[in-house]
Structures are given as C-alpha cells and as structure tokens.
Amino acid sequence: MVANIQAYLENLQQPWGQIYYDILFEQLQDIKGKRLLDFGSGFGLVANHLAKDNEVLAVEPNEEMVALRAQDHPYQQFVGSLDQLASLEDASFDVILCHNVLEYVEDRKVILRELTRLLKPGGLLSIVKHNEVGRVLQTVVFENDPQKALDLLAGQDLETHSMGLAQAYDLGAAVEDLALEIQDYQGIRVFYGLQDNRFKGQEGWRESMLQMERAVCQESPYRDMAFFQHYRLKRS
C-alpha cells in the first residue's frame, strides 16, 4: 500500500488526531534551548512546535508532506532520509526525535546507529513507536475485528489506513549494542483509540479525554496498553 498523504492529513485534523499532539507536546515541554533533529518530520507539526524554543533541523523524505508542512516558527528543513544525515557532524545534537518512523523502514538498525552518532553524550533520543498490545486491543475493541487481531498476534504487520504496513519491533533489542540507554516511557492513546469516533466530536470531549490520558500516561498497566509508547533514551 502506498502512503495516502491526503487521508493522513485529514486524520490528523480530526479531534482524535489533534489530541495525539496535545499529549505529545506536553511530554516534550521540557525541551528548550536545544539543538534538535526531527528525523521523519512528516508535516512538521512537532518540528514547528519545538522551533519556538529550540534550533530545529527537520528531515523528511516525502516531498508532498514537506510541501504541506507547518511553518509558524522558523526551522531548517531537509528533504531526504539517511542521505541527509551523512554530512552532519558527530555529536552535533542535544535532542533527536524519531516518531512513528521505525515501523515503516527496513534499515531500522542503520538508522538507530546513525542517530546515535549524531547525538551528544548525555543527549536525548525521543522515540514514539507502536505498542503491540495496544494495536491488538484497538483492533478487537474499536475495529471489532478479532481475526485481524489474531493475525497481529501471529506476527502479521499492521495495515494502517494511510501509511501502509507498520511492522512491530522490540526497541530494547534494537538498541542493545548501541550507546543508548532506555530511561523511561509514557503511553499515548491509552483510551481514546478504543472509543467510537461519534463521541469525539462532542463539546468538551478533547479536553476531558486529555485530562484522562494525562492522568495515566506514566502509570503501568495503562502505559503498557497504549497504542503508542513514547520512549526517552540517553546517549552514553
């Protein structure tokens, strides 16, 4: 399946797309005064938001997404992928973001090795990834498709509605031989992905659901059943 960029953009503009960024931005609010790389920056929503208080370089291979990117705050944008990273100096970033990228690539290890090279000692690598438990829960509860959920449990990749196949992976295994240490993780989309979309347009839904997600995002077992998990890793 080829990425459907317009469908992806329309989904982000819905209440259930907007609340994802409400939660993520809160989890990133301590990042200020840093030199930051956003690898796989998409429509530039995170790069643009963080550019208010940071020096940001965004890298994205999809030209259509780059053309539609948010630009309320100044930041540098490269079009490309690993090819754009090769010319960057070692240990040149305080913070690197890689959000919902590694599910869609074959060269996951190569990317992680390159991001580690670019990160300063003590620097932060922020990774948002799919959580297999959360994917199965949403498939059974929201989509009402137990057979698809059984296929996911058997190792089948998830067919996303707009970005193609997403492959589950073990982050601990992916970074075990790199100079990266997992510090903590938080959940995103613990509850709201399980709810029928007809509720999500109701007045006050976004605010009340944000309060609920905020209350449990750092707590197990809730963060362990979230659709997305946001990991913070430190460069040793």
Segments and roles (model prediction):
Residues K109-L124:
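A short glycine-rich, Lys/Arg-flanked "PGG" loop and its adjoining helix->strand segment in the class I
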Residues M1-K32, L45-H49, M65-L68, S126-L152, D196:
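Conserved class I S-adenosyl-L-methionine
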Residues A86-V95:
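A short acidic, Gly/Pro-enriched loop at the edge of an enzyme's catalytic core
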Residues F43-Q84:
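Class I SAM-dependent methyltransferase SAM/SAH-binding core
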Residues D184-S236:
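A C-terminal cap/extension of S-adenosyl-L-methionine-dependent methyltransferases
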Residues S162-A179, Y185:
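Short alpha-helix
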Residues V95-D107:
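A short SAM/SAH-binding and catalytic strip from SAM-dependent methyltransferases
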